[in-house]
């Protein structure tokens, strides 16, 4: 370990910043946020420094650097564009045993400043030891996407509760189990974010008084159409908190690699060597795991409420009194069309979109007359095997045989394949494709040649 990570208490302590440019301005913001008494020394200052000085937030000393400016300082930062001046600041600070950071020169510095994820009072710092600041920044951005914005509010609220929790629960183990329940409670987090004080109080009281045995719950999470980058931030947070993840074949391996490592994984899809698990059995798996007190994520491709049978699964949980929540996902129609260069709506060609399933419960029948009208886009989910029937029904109800049509296989994935032609050729196009695939019918398909961006990357 080349550096010892520490967090400095600088409130009301004197700090010197040498430099008055944009870089120095960024450092000044950090020092001010930490509550330091900041003196800034430079030949010239950006307008923001003058604003701060006029507001008596810091002190400006215009002129050449002199070592005596470091007297009584706890910490110094050299942030000029003059290497000689930066070296002078570093040497003067070293002589006085004052920690000094030198921007872009870690070897001259006695401390370095990390990339920061600020969820005050929770702080996360990332550093490469000055060897690769860009890598540290990229890691910070990844962590920013994972850590919920409300964490700071939650941490502050937990601080207010500490005395009561210590009084309520006699042992360290009981207190730990309570905090674990509190920090993963979505309702409390949302109430804090909405500043709903009554809901916060009610939820807290429930957590404090209910048995400490963890109450199971189920979260339906939409994984999106395939590309792991299209998974929502909330979806990512949920799969990283899960005790068990129940998933199907439409969830990509890249997304499964993001699941919490020690979570149990239950595959319920249909894949080579596996038989599809009946829906009723899936419902019972969710129910059984939640009744064990586990946090269950039902991870579905696309959006769980768009041909994902999410409603059926939640009805079972509702009847059993199991708490549940839903995290929407990008549905296949939206993702596949965007990655294929096919806008679902367009002022000249389509004023509406119809999302249609290729499967109906026994006895169901589509309203083909309404589907065959102009100025709309049709998107058929799970319709590949029904392509001949879709072609026949639409043409029989008046849709032109030359209506543009496309089929998207493995949409949004690097293996995405798209074929396009006309409605009259739909059965022939389908023979070239494999599931999972989506059928798109409408004049907007004709824009694909112009707007196809993904395959060109």
UniProtKB/Swiss-Prot annotation:
The modification Phosphoserine is found at residue 128. NAD(+) binds at residues 22-23, 43-44. S-adenosyl-L-methionine binds at residues 225, 301-303, 306, 331-332, 382, 411. Then it catalyzes the NAD-dependent ring dehydrogenation of precorrin-2 to yield sirohydrochlorin. Finally, it catalyzes the ferrochelation of sirohydrochlorin to yield siroheme. Keywords: Cobalamin biosynthesis, Lyase, Methyltransferase, Multifunctional enzyme, NAD, Oxidoreductase, Phosphoprotein, Porphyrin biosynthesis, S-adenosyl-L-methionine, Transferase. GO terms for biological process: cobalamin biosynthetic process; methylation; siroheme biosynthetic process. Pathway: Cofactor biosynthesis; adenosylcobalamin biosynthesis; precorrin-2 from uroporphyrinogen III: step 1/1; Cofactor biosynthesis; adenosylcobalamin biosynthesis; sirohydrochlorin from precorrin-2: step 1/1; Porphyrin-containing compound metabolism; siroheme biosynthesis; precorrin-2 from uroporphyrinogen III: step 1/1; Porphyrin-containing compound metabolism; siroheme biosynthesis; siroheme from sirohydrochlorin: step 1/1. This is Siroheme synthase 2. SUPFAM superfamilies: NAD(P)-binding Rossmann-fold domains, Siroheme synthase middle domains-like, Tetrapyrrole methylase. Residues 216-457 are annotated as: Uroporphyrinogen-III C-methyltransferase. Residues 1-204 are annotated as: Precorrin-2 dehydrogenase /sirohydrochlorin ferrochelatase. Transmembrane segments: none annotated. It catalyses: uroporphyrinogen III + 2 S-adenosyl-L-methionine = precorrin-2 + 2 S-adenosyl-L-homocysteine + H(+); precorrin-2 + NAD(+) = sirohydrochlorin + NADH + 2 H(+); siroheme + 2 H(+) = sirohydrochlorin + Fe(2+). Its EC number is 2.1.1.107, 1.3.1.76, 4.99.1.4. The active site is at residues 248, 270. It comes from the Bacteria. In the N-terminal section; belongs to the precorrin-2 dehydrogenase / sirohydrochlorin ferrochelatase family. In the C-terminal section; belongs to the precorrin methyltransferase family. NCBIfam families: cobA_cysG_Cterm, cysG_Nterm, PRK06136.1, PRK10637.1. GO terms for molecular function: NAD binding; precorrin-2 dehydrogenase activity; sirohydrochlorin ferrochelatase activity; uroporphyrin-III C-methyltransferase activity.
């Amino acid at each position: 370990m080349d550096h010892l990570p520490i967090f400095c208490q600088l409130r009301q302590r004197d700090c010197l910043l040498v430099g008055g440019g944009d870089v120095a301005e960024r450092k000044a913001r950090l020092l001010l946020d930490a509550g330091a008494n900041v003196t800034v020394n430079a030949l010239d200052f950006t307008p923001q420094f003058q604003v701060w000085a006029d507001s008596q937030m810091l002190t400006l000393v215009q002129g050449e650097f002199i070592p005596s400016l470091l007297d009584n300082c706890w910490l110094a930062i050299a942030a000029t564009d003059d290497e000689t001046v930066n070296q002078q600041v570093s040497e003067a600070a070293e002589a006085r045993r004052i920690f000094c950071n030198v921007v872009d020169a870690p070897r001259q510095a006695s401390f370095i400043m990390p990339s920061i994820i600020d969820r005050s009072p929770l702080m996360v710092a990332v550093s490469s030891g000055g060897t690769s600041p860009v890598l540290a920044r990229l890691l910070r951005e990844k962590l920013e996407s994972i850590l919920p914005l409300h964490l700071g509010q939650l941490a502050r609220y937990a601080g207010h509760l500490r005395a009561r929790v210590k009084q309520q629960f006699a042992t360290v183990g009981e207190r730990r189990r309570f905090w674990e329940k509190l920090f993963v409670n979505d309702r409390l987090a949302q109430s804090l974010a909405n500043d709903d004080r009554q809901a916060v109080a009610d939820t807290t009281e429930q957590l404090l008084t209910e048995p400490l045995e963890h109450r199971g719950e189920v979260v339906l999470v939409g994984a999106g159409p395939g590309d792991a980058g299209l998974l929502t931030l909330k979806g990512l947070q949920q799969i990283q908190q899960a005790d068990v993840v129940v998933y199907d074949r439409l969830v990509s391996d890249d997304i499964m690699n993001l699941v919490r490592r020690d979570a149990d994984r239950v595959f319920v899809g249909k894949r080579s060597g596996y038989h599809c698990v009946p829906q009723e059995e899936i419902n019972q798996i969710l129910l059984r795991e939640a009744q064990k007190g586990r946090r269950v994520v039902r991870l579905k491709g696309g959006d769980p409420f768009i041909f994902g049978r999410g409603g059926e699964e939640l009805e079972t949980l509702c009847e059993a009194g199991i708490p549940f929540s839903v995290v929407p996902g990008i549905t296949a129609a939206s993702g596949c069309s965007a990655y294929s260069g096919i806008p679902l709506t367009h002022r000249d060609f389509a004023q509406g979109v119809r999302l249609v399933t290729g499967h109906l419960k026994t006895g169901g029948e589509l309203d083909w007359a309404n589907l065959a009208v102009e100025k709309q886009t049709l998107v058929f989910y799970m319709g590949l095997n029904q392509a001949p029937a879709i072609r026949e029904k639409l043409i029989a109800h008046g849709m032109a045989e030359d209506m543009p049509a496309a089929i998207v296989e493995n949409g949004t994935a690097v293996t995405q394949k798209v074929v396009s032609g006309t409605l009259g050729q739909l059965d022939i196009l389908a023979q070239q494709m494999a599931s999972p695939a989506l059928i798109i019918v409408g004049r907007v398909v004709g824009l694909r040649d112009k707007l196809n961006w993904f395959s060109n990357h």
